[in-house]
């Protein structure tokens, strides 16, 4: 894991999502990432309904820009907590099993 990228993800999370949950999952969280591995983030919003475009622009795109700065791919998936908790899926299973909450 690239510690510099991880620290900048933490800083960005505190700036744009101070009261929301962000979870790192995938190879970076498991500790088996290669130098070219992407960064998978789950963003859980404390609101009832998502506005896909607005939420992407506000909460996912800043992580895209951070990835560009470091020549890395950072994928932020945005859900409301309500939607995330109401739908079982393989993704949810993997996030719950291997995820690391970003403080």
Question: Where are the predicted features?
Answer:
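Short beta-strand->loop micro-motif that forms the acidic, two-metal-ion catalytic signature
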Residues: 39-44
């Amino acid at each position: 894991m690239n510690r510099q990228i991880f620290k900048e993800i933490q800083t960005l999370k505190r700036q744009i999502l101070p009261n929301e949950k962000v979870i790192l999952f995938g190879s970076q969280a498991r500790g088996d990432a290669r130098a070219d591995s992407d960064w998978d983030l789950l963003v859980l919003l404390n609101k009832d309904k998502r506005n896909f475009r607005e939420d992407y622009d506000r909460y996912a795109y800043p992580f895209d820009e951070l990835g560009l700065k470091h020549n890395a791919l950072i994928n932020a998936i945005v859900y409301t907590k309500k939607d995330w908790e109401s739908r079982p899926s393989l993704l949810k299973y993997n996030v719950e099993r291997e995820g690391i909450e970003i403080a």
